[in-house]
A protein has these predicted regions:
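Proline/glycine-anchored alpha-helix kink/cap motifs
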Residues: 105-111, 130-142, 165-180, 202
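Short beta-strand elements
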Residues: 104-109, 197-206, 210-216
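Helix-loop-helix module between adjacent transmembrane segments
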Residues: 114-116, 151-157
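Extended, polar/acidic
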Residues: 1-131
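Short, solvent-exposed amphipathic alpha-helical segments in soluble enzyme
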Residues: 36-38, 132-138, 195-196
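Glycine-rich and small/hydrophobic secondary-structure elements
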Residues: 2-29, 154-206
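Beta-strand segments within the central parallel beta-sheet cores of soluble alpha/beta enzyme folds
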Residues: 141-148, 175-184, 211-215
Length: 216
């Protein structure tokens, strides 16, 4: 299935999802997953922001490596820059949210009524509903998303990660499907807080009035 919501033929990182196994027990599914064989062509990699922005850099996505180029600030090109310049650079690492509860989703499809029900500890109940409906080509009125009690999130459960795959599996098999990640899988295969490199330039006069502050 060449559908990036589920899988993608262009693997970009360790933890990228390439296949799924549905079985009667977690043990059978794990054993079957070990037997999957992949043929992967190694592509040029990019590991830093600076390398990704270089001319001729390997393109991780078809539409380029840059997500957006927002512009904001005051002073600088909008006013006369005066006084001493102060430059502050900072860097943060990639951070996992480490919610007490790992990611989990359950889906059940009723072929008689063409109704899908998805249970998950999500922060985006209506996002799950619209995503599953669009993916399966079902009316939104036929999809019900139920938010279960959440064992922590801190933002990591805003995205639809397991819910679409569980729903597809349930519709394919007409049986309930449960997907649950352990701690290692949650760190490798779900969303993390992005590492950030920032630079702030400020110009101040002797009277400590700030005249320019372009950020990036």
């Amino acid at each position: 299935v060449d559908q990036e919501t589920l899988f993608n033929r262009h693997v970009r990182f360790v933890g990228d999802r390439v296949a799924a196994v549905l079985a009667d027990t977690p043990e059978i599914a794990a054993a079957a997953a070990e037997k999957i064989k992949l043929e992967i062509e190694e592509l040029p990699a990019v590991f830093t922001v600076e390398d990704a922005m270089k001319e001729g850099a390997p393109q991780l996505h078809e539409d380029g490596n840059t997500v957006t180029l927002p512009e904001c600030g005051f002073g600088g090109r909008y006013a006369d820059v005066q006084g001493e310049e102060f430059i502050h650079r900072s860097q943060t690492q990639r951070v996992s949210h480490i919610a007490m509860e790992t990611h989990c989703a359950v889906a059940d499809y009723n072929p008689g009524t063409d109704r899908m029900t998805v249970w998950s500890p999500t922060q985006s109940t209506f996002g799950v509903r619209s995503c599953v409906a669009a993916l399966l080509g079902m009316p939104m009125s036929h999809v019900r998303a139920i938010k279960t009690p959440m064992g922590g999130s801190f933002g990591c459960k805003q995205e639809m990660i397991l819910e679409p795959l569980a729903a597809v599996g349930a519709k394919m098999t007409c049986r309930p499907v449960k997907l649950q990640l352990d701690r290692r899988e949650t760190i490798l295969c779900t969303v993390l807080r992005h590492p950030i490199k920032s630079e702030i330039r400020a110009n101040s006069t002797k009277a400590y009035s700030q005249s320019a502050r372009p950020d990036r």
